Amino acid sequence: MGQKVNPVGLRIGVIRDWESKWYAGKDYADFLHEDLKIREFINQRLSDASVSKVEIERAANRVNITIHTAKPGMVIGKGGSEVEALRKALNSLTGKRVHINILEIKRADLDAQLVADNIARQLENRISFRRAQKQQIQRTMRAGAQGIKTMVSGRLGGADIARSEYYSEGTVPLHTLRADIDYATSEADTTYGKLGVKVWIYRGEVLPTKKKTEEGGK
């Protein structure tokens, strides 16, 4: 059987960019572990703020962090109190000067990470995995997606044998590199164990297609 490559990693350098932007020689491993700690800390602290992704840039002894969220008000807090507390916590965590930017996600239903997290939260609240997937697919298609596929794996409905069930609508061209496909995973902790959630969202083509010139000067 053929295995599916991560659609985001496959498109880096074509239509996607890196989420960590820095150069390191012998400090590479330290920077990588620090990035993982920063992302884990932010995702835990802002678990209710619908955080999609965290971009990290480095310059000398300074770390620039960009948080993509659907609820910027929760991240900033009253008068900027929350984001200032977060900055101080990250300062002590990294030992470097941290600058935080916040970008709002206008359409949360077109963001694969937020969609996957939403399905996972519904599964934790004992909503049927079929209903959770079908409702989310309808919302995403209404938001303007050209295609979506969702998959939930694990002990579905408390079954003894784990299995996977997926639903899709529209088209999701995984082989087309110019196709803007957002992919994300999430986990749901249920009484029967963990359920894995995967989401692919096709948002249209990014690069313009070249017009074919007719031969013979016609």
Curated annotation (Swiss-Prot):
Q: Which Pfam families match?
A: KH_2, Ribosomal_S3_C
Tell me the keywords, alphabetical order.
Ribonucleoprotein, Ribosomal protein, RNA-binding, rRNA-binding
Q: Which Gene3D superfamilies match?
A: 3.30.300.20, Ribosomal protein S3, C-terminal domain
**Record's InterPro entries?**
KH_dom (IPR004087), KH_dom-like_a/b (IPR015946), KH_dom_type_2 (IPR004044), KH_sf_prok-type (IPR009019), Ribosomal_S3_C_sf (IPR036419), Ribosomal_uS3_bac-typ (IPR005704), Ribosomal_uS3_C (IPR001351), Ribosomal_uS3_CS (IPR018280)
Domain KH type-2 positions? 38-106
**Alphabetized PANTHER family for the sequence:** 30S/40S RIBOSOMAL PROTEIN S3, SMALL RIBOSOMAL SUBUNIT PROTEIN US3C
Subunit structure, per the record?
Part of the 30S ribosomal subunit. Forms a tight complex with proteins S10 and S14.
Protein name per the record: Small ribosomal subunit protein uS3
Which species is the source of this protein?
Bacillus licheniformis (strain ATCC 14580 / DSM 13 / JCM 2505 / CCUG 7422 / NBRC 12200 / NCIMB 9375 / NCTC 10341 / NRRL NRS-1264 / Gibson 46)
